[in-house]
Amino acid sequence: MAKGFYISKALGILGILLGVAAVATIIALSVVYAQEKNKNAEHVPQAPTSPTITTTAAITLDQSKPWNRYRLPTTLLPDSYNVTLRPYLTPNADGLYIFKGKSIVRLLCQEPTDVIIIHSKKLNYTTQGHMVVLRGVGDSQVPEIDRTELVELTEYLVVHLKGSLQPGHMYEMESEFQGELADDLAGFYRSEYMEGNVKKVLATTQMQSTDARKSFPCFDEPAMKATFNITLIHPNNLTALSNMPPKGSSTPLAEDPNWSVTEFETTPVMSTYLLAYIVSEFQSVNETAQNGVLIRIWARPNAIAEGHGMYALNVTGPILNFFANHYNTSYPLPKSDQIALPDFNAGAMENWGLVTYRENALLFDPQSSSISNKERVVTVIAHELAHQWFGNLVTLAWWNDLWLNEGFASYVEYLGADHAEPTWNLKDLIVPGDVYRVMAVDALASSHPLTTPAEEVNTPAQISEMFDSISYSKGASVIRMLSNFLTEDLFKEGLASYLHAFAYQNTTYLDLWEHLQKAVDAQTSIRLPDTVRAIMDRWTLQMGFPVITVDTKTGNISQKHFLLDSESNVTRSSAFDYLWIVPISSIKNGVMQDHYWLRDVSQAQNDLFKTASDDWVLLNVNVTGYFQVNYDEDNWRMIQHQLQTNLSVIPVINRAQVIYDSFNLATAHMVPVTLALDNTLFLNGEKEYMPWQAALSSLSYFSLMFDRSEVYGPMKKYLRKQVEPLFQHFETLTKNWTERPENLMDQYSEINAISTACSNGLPQCENLAKTLFDQWMSDPENNPIHPNLRSTIYCNAIAQGGQDQWDFAWGQLQQAQLVNEADKLRSALACSNEVWLLNRYLGYTLNPDLIRKQDATSTINSIASNVIGQPLAWDFVQSNWKKLFQDYGGGSFSFSNLIQGVTRRFSSEFELQQLEQFKKNNMDVGFGSGTRALEQALEKTKANIKWVKENKEVVLNWFIEHS
């Protein structure tokens, strides 16, 4: 699943607006982590009761009863399912949308058992008498059913038998049921959109991780693989899709010719969370790939007619071919459908053969979409198609190893997208998009290892917590590091061996290490200091990462667990004492040096890192290692001198690294904050995107801490001075903003130039924004603002303006036909400086007719990113937490993002007290998947308070001196 924030799976890059309006997203990251699923606790009518049916909600779980444990017993394994579903796309007499279903699951008994336990959630069983009918297969004798019950807390349907099922025998269990086709974005749900003035309704799915059980009774764990025969009964004017192609043409339903029956081919052996089925009037654009695979892009008819699916169609074939070669394994299905949904809480979902997307992750309009929208489409597609092998063909055994699934896809998405767009240098974007982004979380004492013990991940909420930036971005970072020190060819060799060995099966991360080790052992050119497992265990089984410190006078090199707050208490022990086996590359005076391994010791010495008086050395070339680097002050000063005299000697990524690392080290009190600020002085001569992005990203923290204090004025003045040469460069290059640079990185650099100039008050930029927006308001049918610049221009113009500008943008949002344009407007509306407008906007997030449920939390976070909106958003969340939690479901990963977003500025004792009181006040409601984020927010707030006290005066003086 893509980072929905994935989140937010990168994918794009975050542009920082350090202005009066806010810190706003300019280059959107592929739905960075705000995602997965919404579990809406909506009311579902109960089935008629009978003496043989009981509904149990266990309060105190008696663990001796298997139905009170969250993990399924292994006494029964599913072999196959036959599932028929009929969604009703108009409400019934009670005003509810429902679906009806029938399921036959064939079971293989592994051990004698007198109870059948199968997942079921919010389903009402309509079978007469007992909830199910049980039959033997072949000569298998079936005992009578004693009683059936629903256990609400553990989400089970339990069938108690009067005798035992026998090992080696097959049985079939049949049930009929109905459920609500709710708008809760989970399981089998409904999505709505407007076509003109007509409301259209479609039925779609989101099963990951634990909501297949909301669609039909099933063994809803990833290792419980089976084959599926899906049949959909649907209105005859609509199209039915599922994982596999239809067996033939749809046939009329015998009892009602207005309905059609579509039966699909049997799936391969697969996990329940990868199932998908959709009923809609969507249309598609199609092509057949060279290998015979049918590729189709589905969307609303208007979007297809306007060509918004063509870019996705054009890149899908090359990406599929790339991964088939990368994995040395053919694409395992006969077709690849991808569909853009109006309502979808994840960024995208890798359902096997029927991938679902948010519209802004699949659709692209060359006339109205920005370059970052285009980059997002190609990277999200690459992420999801990577899963068709790694995750779908070979699947994790349990959710505690989610990082292997999502981390791997989050790494190779850059490779697949780079193949589709070879001139963009997309592979470099993993550094700002994933590596440094996740280090900010992984450097907290409240972080967690990539691999979590299976026994700690049981409930749906615990599973949802696995879908975080550690799993996605740290997973991607360490797999990239592994591929780099093995070499990509050797890595691919081991990967292909792994996929061939475990096709249609389940694995743990140890299985991948074993096959990579076999590839290492079969050659002699790559020599490792230890086994793949021994090296990687230190990166996956302990949280955090090291800071490597070099003393260039002696050549001494040491490592230490890096913590942003060096005084924080690390309560999680490590079998490796927080030491790592670290692959180190280095440059001395612009020349590459031999590779070096720092073993799992705290200190070593090597002359590679020793310099003469005028020399400098720089470690972690292109940031292929997952660590940060500190030097003695003389070496830092020599690097600064090199950057200010001839910056091209240092690779672009490492120019960004110097900024990222030094600011993080300053936060951790390992270097003076003035040294980090000195590392930005060279930017007045820098034209490349990544160093500027590093500075803006790092300084965004300064903005959050100081935009309510006297530091902010001198800080803005300094940034105006530094960015003005870049602004003038692109003003000339683009012929006064009438053209766009040719390559991706230059376009991103242009966006940073104009966003930084406008948000820090450069008059010519503010005038540009006002002029362009005024032109648009005077002629709404002709938008003169290039899509690349719209986020910046919209935000700045709304910040400068008042109600007229806000209402105009809101009106344009209501009319927007392209979701990318709607996203830009929705974010920009949060830039207003009018308190009453922001409060009104917050209220809109509680009304799904005004702000879609999938967009509610990101809208609140956009308002919170505005210095004026932040206290309003915090008050709003406090006042409405119970409603938000109940309406959206505590399992939704977006709660983690919401807590992070509204507390980012917290840096005072009063705000800390408020946060602690918020925790206390809502213990009865709970925080669901936001529980860890709340603890991290408390930790960050304490660190912020301390940092501001220690650094405010010196930072103020530095900005005054250099502005």
From Swiss-Prot:
Residues 33-963 are extracellular. The active site is at E384. GO terms for cellular component: cytoplasm; extracellular space; plasma membrane. Residues 65-963 are annotated as: Metalloprotease. Zn(2+) binds at H383, H387, E406. One of its GO terms (biological process) is cell differentiation. Substrate binds at G347, A348, M349, E350, N351. The keyword Acetylation does not apply. Residues 717-813 are annotated as: Interaction with TGEV spike glycoprotein. It comes from the Eukaryota. InterPro entries: Aminopeptidase_N-like_N, Aminopeptidase_N-like_N_sf, ERAP1-like_C_dom, M1_APN-typ, Peptidase_M1, Peptidase_M1_aminopeptidases, Peptidase_M1_dom, Peptidase_M4/M1_CTD_sf. Broad specificity aminopeptidase which plays a role in the final digestion of peptides generated from hydrolysis of proteins by gastric and pancreatic proteases. Also involved in the processing of various peptides including peptide hormones, such as angiotensin III and IV, neuropeptides, and chemokines. May also be involved the cleavage of peptides bound to major histocompatibility complex class II molecules of antigen presenting cells. May have a role in angiogenesis and promote cholesterol crystallization. Keywords: Aminopeptidase, Angiogenesis, Cell membrane, Developmental protein, Differentiation, Disulfide bond, Glycoprotein, Host cell receptor for virus entry, Host-virus interaction, Hydrolase, Membrane, Metal-binding, Metalloprotease, Protease, Receptor, Signal-anchor, Sulfation, Transmembrane, Transmembrane helix, Zinc. Disulfide bonds join C758-C765, C795-C831. Belongs to the peptidase M1 family. It is an enzyme of class 3 (hydrolase). Its cofactor is Zn(2+). The gene is ANPEP. Glycans are attached at N82, N124, N229, N237, N258, N286, N314, N328, N506, N556, N569, N622, N646, N736. This is Aminopeptidase N. The record marks Y472 as: Transition state stabilizer. Residues 33-64 are annotated as: Cytosolic Ser/Thr-rich junction. Its main location: membrane. Its EC number is 3.4.11.2. Sulfated. N- and O-glycosylated. Binds 1 zinc ion per subunit.
